[in-house]
């Protein structure tokens, strides 16, 4: 709903969106069934078998294709730009889930890239853009004011979120400067 409304354009390919939904539902169901029968990699939050991770990546790429073309061919706003940055960041940091080193410390280093930077980094961009969209639509506040605050919010969220990731690295043997931050 948000993307077509903000871009003032229909979604690029509704058929592709339905294909993506079907693949997503199949992958989610397969992952849950796999968890029930003990078919997983054993990494917390990243325990999906490789073929499900590949399916998640394909679904994400279909989604990004559809959303990106909708925004790029429609009206470009700060809200849609921040939303696209967050969605692409989510996809990029997901790629670290494929790397599964034998060394536990190295594994945790990359694990935090996916888990922590998602939550306190790129998902903050998605949430801030959705919040800005809702503020404009529900309160009638001027778009310029909301977009200025959007930039302030995402700047603070990214800065504090990325710094906040550093304290996790202390416990895996990385330099201790992240602990003090």
Question: Where are the language model's segments positioned?
Answer:
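Membrane-interface helix-loop-helix modules in multi-pass inner-membrane proteins
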Residues: 1-74, 98-102, 161-181
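Hydrophobic, membrane-embedded alpha-helices of multi-pass small-molecule transporters
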Residues: 91-97, 117-128
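Histidine-centered catalytic micro-motifs
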Residues: 1, 108-122
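Hydrophobic membrane-spanning alpha-helices of multi-pass integral membrane proteins
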Residues: 22-28, 59, 86-93, 124, ...
